[in-house]
Amino acid sequence: MNTLLRLPITRFSWVSFCAILLVVAAPPAWAEDRGAQIFETQCASCHGNEGVALKTPILHGQEPAYIVRSLMAFRHGGRIDQIMMSMNGIASGLTEEDIGLVARYLAGQDPCDLDIKIDYGREGFREAFSAGREKYASSNCGHCHESFHHFAPRIMGQKASYLKLALSQFQ
């Protein structure tokens, strides 16, 4: 079960959270390079050097507030990594500034630039795509997962295998 939504933001101080978001909103000139460096050394081995990985979510273009909240939840034990079993340790090694910088870096990456292979001709693809679109619309997923809701992750463009796993953790 995913415990991220159960983590009250008061578990880590509002001051820390706001300070991290200030780094995201108004970074110094070197922030992009430092954020990229943190991603390459701490994140890319699981999340992919080019932003695409097999078992983990695509982080490129993700909402910065969601990344900050997720990393803080992993760091403080309010969210448990049930996929790779390593996020809690990785996040605990990041400073608040590191978290803000990597969140800003990832938010600035265009997910449309990712080289994601989709087999449109695969048997059953059209039916599965249509069923997914209908389920998305009827379940009101977009209410939280569209770009205007900054605490929910962007799910458009995520891999089906990851979405299935993530959804199973919410049941």
Where are the predicted features?
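Axial heme c-ligation environment in periplasmic c-type cytochrome domains
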Residues: A53-H60, F74-D110, L114-R122, H150-M156, ...
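N-terminal targeting signals for Sec/Tat export/insertion, comprising classic cleavable signal peptides
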Residues: A36-G61, A65-A73
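N-terminal secretory signal peptides that target proteins for export/translocation
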Residues: M1-F12
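Short microdomains enriched in Cys/His and/or Lys/Arg
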Residues: P64-F74, A160-Q171
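Disulfide-stabilized extracellular ectodomain repeats and their linkers
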Residues: E40-C43, T56, P64, M84, ...
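Bacterial N-terminal signal peptides
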Residues: S13-A25
